[in-house]
Regions:
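Short S/T/G/P-rich N-terminal loop/turn motif that feeds into the first structured element of a domain
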Residues: 1-57, 61-66, 75-79, 102-124
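An amphipathic, aromatic/His-enriched active-site/gating alpha helix that lines ligand/cofactor pockets
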Residues: 71-106
Length: 124
């Protein structure tokens, strides 16, 4: 059952993917044309990026790159790993997940305070 309440997904994770081969890279990239033959809006992509275990909020992928990365919101590293596997992305690329305690962006509201509570372990 798809969890629609994503408010509890508070932690930020970056996933770095490395395509298993050039063929797998091409297959992955062309799969979106099959999934969205008439194109897709950012809104529809965002709606589809809410998974059972984690939510993918951003992805960066170059046409000629052998790797790509995504930004996820989730409760745990394990939840992100389960989400990547449930979408089948691991059939195209190896991946590793890194929790990032600090997420700053020019896309966030300009007056939003950046949470530095866990930034670089304040006790260092």
């Amino acid at each position: 059952m798809l969890e629609t309440n994503t408010e509890n997904r508070k932690k930020n994770y970056i996933v770095i993917y490395d395509f298993l081969s050039e063929k797998k890279s091409d297959e992955y990239k062309s799969s979106f044309n099959k999934l969205y033959p008439k194109g897709v809006t950012h809104g529809k992509w965002a709606e589809d990026a809410v998974g059972e275990f984690a939510t993918c909020s951003q992805t960066w992928l170059g046409n000629n790159s052998t790797f790509f990365c995504s930004h996820y919101l989730a409760n745990s590293k394990e939840d992100v790993e389960k989400q990547v596997q449930s979408w089948g992305t691991d059939k195209y690329a190896s991946f590793f997940v890194v929790e990032v305690e600090r997420f700053t962006s020019s896309l966030k509201p300009k007056d939003e305070i950046i949470n530095l509570d866990n930034w670089y372990e304040n006790n260092k």
